[in-house]
Amino acid sequence: MKNILIVTGGSGGHVVPSTSLFEHLKNKFSVKMVSDLRGSKYINTEKFKYELIDVPNLFLKPYLLPINIFKYFLNIFQSIRFLKNNKTNIVISTGGYMTFPFCLAAFILQKKVFLFEPNSVLGRSNRFALKFSTKIICYDENLRNFPIKYNSKKVIVKPILKKEIYNLEKNIINLKKEIKKILIIGGSQGASFFDENITELIIEISKKRNFEVIQQISNINNLSSIKNKYDKSNINYKFIEFTNDSHELYNGIDLAITRGGASTLSELSFLNIPFISIPLPSARDNHQFYNSEFYYK
């Protein structure tokens, strides 16, 4: 049995797809997963075992660059030792700065490196590792920032979703349904924009028809204010926090308002739930915009 290591971390956009991949591989391979501290909060520890790694972001604090460069090289040697000790045959990177030391270590040890890119824009770490990778798995055939000379490495697949999603019934659009249910989720990084602007939009729409709102609150300090506004407008609402178990939110949803994360959009699309995507403006390489454009097409 092949030993596979999935390397992930950072935002939920990197981590959530890696857990879906883990689920699909674990019955045929021996699979391990490593993540950094930031990414670990998006991993359901009851379902997935993982090891914590500490990889510095080289450019986050420029004044620490010399120290971080030393730590980064140290990470490469630690990654080599980790792969040797675990007899790893294949490394799969889901992107993020913390994945590159393991990819480079695998290359040094002549192990296979597979890249997994769920976004419609090739991320920087995967871009750096592309040269010595075996294949890159992606959803979008027109992956942006992708060098043409590596086209032979590209493998296009349908979105890899959590197994729970496949067990849900697909949404049947019912225009005659009296009370619609709207899901508002700002993604793993939250969205203060949603707390303020989308809340006002919901209040305005509520003047014309009744509906139920399930809303992720990005900033707990906004909870009381939003609650008071909804109470005054007689809106039926439920507040939620970000959850790794997104499948629990989709039942009976008629419309979703969301950021442009690849995992969320692929789940909504699969379940035939109409959605309005508002991409995160600060997303690197504007990838959330292109994710949204991919599903718009």
Regions found by a protein language model. Give the residues of each.
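Short hydrophobic beta-strand element within catalytic cores of glycosyltransferases
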Residues: 258, 274-285
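A short, glycine/small-residue-rich beta-strand->loop->alpha-helix junction that serves as a flexible
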Residues: 6-19, 192
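Active-site-proximal region of nucleotide-activated glycan assembly enzymes
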Residues: 38, 108-169
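Acidic donor-binding loop of glycosyltransferase active sites
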Residues: 88-89, 251-266, 273-274
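An amphipathic, basic-hydrophobic alpha-helix
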Residues: 61-90, 108
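Conserved nucleotide-sugar phosphate-binding/catalytic loop shared by glycosyltransferases and other
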Residues: 6-9, 28-71, 157
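An aromatic- and histidine-rich active-site surface loop
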Residues: 39-41, 90-109
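Donor-nucleotide binding loops and adjacent catalytic segments primarily
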Residues: 19, 24, 34, 40-46, ...
